[in-house]
């Protein structure tokens, strides 16, 4: 579904991503871990076309996409939940969700399934996004990314600043989506236990490069907890 080969990215004179390789498959959660500042968010932005890569290739659904725009990548079936959520504070919950359908016909309805995944959103459709709690905003950001039915969902630290009960709900939704088998999920996460619980495969980054990768079931045996400990 997603294949990243030898991508490099620079910022000024700094080499941010160094020959990064990874794969994400349908029905699997690929977790990317690493200490702060190792290039995880830059990698996700590169996958979305928000940051250009200098060299390397990114293939999605069998086609190279490294030269396409963020809009084209979203339209091809990639959903993105950025760090910090980036919901529209002055728009209602319903309007925020409709932003995920921006390239669909105006008559396209919000998928009812989103309210099944996140029941709280149905109760707050007319509330402004800025009035929601951090956890509710995160659920809204994920719902917005799911609205168009992506084949690849990319999430950047969805548990950051979120209360434990909602972290469990988000984990449940991620696992459910992966288990259906028609979506690949790439998750950057600092919360090790959450990452370990969800990971079908893991990637550990250090100084912009992939330090280790393997089967999620082997994370503890492979010493991943120690690799990412602050």
Task: Tell me the role of every PLM-derived stretch.
Residues 56-64, 76, 109-110, 116, ...:
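Conserved ABC transporter NBD signature motif
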Residues 147-151:
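A short, proline-enriched helix->beta-strand linker immediately N-terminal to the Walker B motif
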Residues 64-84, 111, 123-126, 219-224:
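ABC ATPase NBD coupling module
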Residues 48:
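Helix-to-loop junction immediately C-terminal to a conserved catalytic motif
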Residues 128-132, 136:
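Conserved ABC ATPase signature
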Residues 33-35:
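The feature captures the beta-strand-to-loop junction immediately N-terminal to the Walker
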Residues 91, 132, 145-146:
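ABC ATPase signature
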